[in-house]
UniProtKB/Swiss-Prot annotation:
It holds the Pfam family Methylase_S. One of its GO terms (biological process) is DNA restriction-modification system. One of its GO terms (molecular function) is DNA binding. It comes from Salmonella typhimurium (strain LT2 / SGSC1412 / ATCC 700720). It comes from the Bacteria. Type I restriction and modification enzymes are complex, multifunctional systems which require ATP, S-adenosyl methionine and Mg(2+) as cofactors and, in addition to their endonucleolytic and methylase activities, are potent DNA-dependent ATPases. Keywords: DNA-binding, Restriction system. PANTHER family: TYPE I RESTRICTION ENZYME ECOKI SPECIFICITY SUBUNIT, TYPE-1 RESTRICTION ENZYME ECOKI SPECIFICITY PROTEIN. Belongs to the type-I restriction system S methylase family. The keyword DNA-binding applies. This is Type I restriction enzyme StySJI specificity subunit. The specificity (S) subunit of a type I restriction enzyme; this subunit dictates DNA sequence specificity. The M and S subunits together form a methyltransferase (MTase) that methylates two adenine residues of the sequence 5'-GAGN(6)GTRC-3'. In the presence of the R subunit the complex can also act as an endonuclease, binding to the same target sequence but cutting the DNA some distance from this site. Whether the DNA is cut or modified depends on the methylation state of the target sequence. When the target site is unmodified, the DNA is cut. Contains two DNA recognition domains, each specifying recognition of one of the two defined components of the target sequence. The recognition domains can be exchanged between different S proteins, generating enzymes that have new sequence specificities. The gene is hsdS.
Length: 469
């Protein structure tokens, strides 16, 4: 870990000098222990282990061994880069085993705080440099033992390690809490947008325009203004299908000027341009009748997202449409396409579509059924006013969502920023000033490293005794 001037009382060392790497255990075969596969190791800083209880005889061979207060982390890609690491806590009888793709770091006689050591392996510096020092084939690269053993570390005194670990737990819990709250907002905004659409198509969004007119309950069990009408989509527009590629033909990434709209692009009321593919000219000529015009509406008719609807934007004028969707075109002069899009996307119509798909045998929305789908129809002038109000409210929601995403980006970088401050000594500067006796003399990091060295020398050559519950 690179760094400038060390804080007072700190010293430099390596992981190999500070702790034991992948030490072995000798336990009674009938001892209950925890077994934790890679999936049980969290990626978040404050995540918990997920393990099951097994007999030691079942897991003592062919797995990595560890005990309470060991720090374990994944050494294989992409688990290493994803930050799979944890301090072992509350395992049955204090012992466990798991994937052979773990590295285990064990403090020597408690002279290194395991939670501080865990913070070290979660830093960006450790993860970045570890990823650059992998060996093996693609998809099976692993952090090398040489990198791990020789990784340089700025070491605080033991008392300060504890303070750093506690501060990190507190600060990063606050980060997680903030992140969790921010991550809830997009779902709240999604519900808000749907509630706006519902209010738009049942007259509540413009109810002040109907002070003199009563609302009526329709056969759709929706209360709407008495001046509004109920009809069918086919009475006000044509419904036509898209077209699959001719047999043996395929799409290409090169922009030929003939875009092909696939079902996966039909989202959020529009056509998403990401991953756009194209037709070669000779193929397009053979299916040229199955194009869309800007302002047409689309609705998906098969697949997991059946019923997704929206408007074809200008940039997709004359594009070909997938056979997995239909277009609604040639609209009557009494219907505004943007209002029809709101109706198609409303929970009222989506519930009708979903109910029929679930009860039907084909799992497909037939063109004839689209024509017969109900349509709530306000006066044309009010349709335009409804759309204006909806778009205004959606713009507010979009602004909030953008601010939330920017805040999430900042929050996501906070963890590494805080960890970097911790290993520069910035989180504990005041503590050091208030506790000089805990960072100097025999309490200094230099003295601590000498103790570790002495303990290691004293324990060298001694066999590990068999442990019992």
């Amino acid at each position: 870990m690179s760094g400038g001037k060390l804080p007072e009382g700190w010293a430099t060392s390596t992981i190999n000098e500070m702790c034991n790497l992948n030490p072995k255990l000798k336990l009674d075969d009938d001892l209950d222990v925890g077994f934790m596969p890679m999936a049980g190791v969290p990626t978040t800083y404050l995540g918990k282990c997920n393990f099951e209880t097994k007999k030691w005889s079942e897991v003592k061979k062919g797995f990595t061994q560890f005990q309470n207060d060991d720090v374990i982390f994944a050494k294989i890609t992409p688990c290493f880069e994803n930050g799979k690491a944890v301090v072992i806590k509350e395992f049955p009888n204090g012992y466990g085993a798991g994937s052979t793709e773990y590295y285990v770091l064990r403090s020597i006689n408690g002279l290194i705080n395991p939670h501080w050591l865990f913070a070290l392996v979660k830093t960006k510096d450790f993860l970045t440099n570890g990823a650059l020092n992998m060996s093996g084939s693609v998809g099976h690269k692993r952090v090398t033992k040489e990198f791990l053993e020789n990784y340089g570390v700025p070491v605080p005194p033991l008392a300060e390690q504890k303070v750093i670990a506690e501060k990190l737990d507190t600060l990063l819990a606050q980060v997680d809490s903030t992140k969790a709250r921010l991550e809830q907002i997009p779902q709240i905004l999604k519900r808000f947008r749907q509630s706006v659409i519902v209010a738009a198509v049942n007259g509540q969004l413009t109810k002040e325009l109907h002070k003199k007119n009563k609302f009526k309950l329709t056969e759709l069990n929706i209360s709407i203004p008495s001046l509004w009408k109920i009809s069918e989509i086919g009475q006000f527009a044509d419904v036509k299908g898209g077209k699959r590629l001719p047999k043996g033909e395929s799409l290409i990434a090169e922009n030929t000027g003939f875009p092909y709209i696939r079902a996966g692009q039909l989202k959020n009321g529009t056509v998403l341009p990401e991953g756009q593919l194209y037709l070669e000219e000779y193929i397009q000529k053979s299916i040229s009748r199955y194009t869309v015009s800007s302002g047409d509406l689309y609705i998906t008719i098969v697949g997991a997202c059946i019923g997704d609807a929206g408007i074809i934007p200008d940039v997709y004028n004359n594009a070909n449409l997938t056979e997995n969707a239909a277009k609604i075109c040639n609209l009557n002069e009494n219907i505004f396409n943007r209002f029809l899009s709101l109706w198609l996307r409303s929970s009222y119509l989506q519930d009708i579509i979903n109910s029929e798909i679930k009860s039907g045998a084909q799992g497909k929305l037939a063109l004839a059924r689209i024509k017969s789908l109900p349509l709530i129809l306000p006066p044309l002038q009010e349709q335009h006013e409804i759309v204006r109000r909806v778009e205004q409210l959606f713009a507010y929601a979009d602004t909030i969502e953008k601010q939330v995403n920017n805040a999430l980006t900042r929050v996501n970088s906070l963890t590494q920023s805080i960890l970097a401050k911790a290993f520069r000594g910035e989180l504990t500067a005041q503590w050091r000033a208030e506790n000089p006796e805990l960072i100097s003399g025999e309490n200094s990091a230099a003295a601590l490293l000498e103790k570790i060295k002495a303990e290691r020398a004293a324990s060298g050559g001694k066999k590990t005794s068999r442990k019992k519950a």
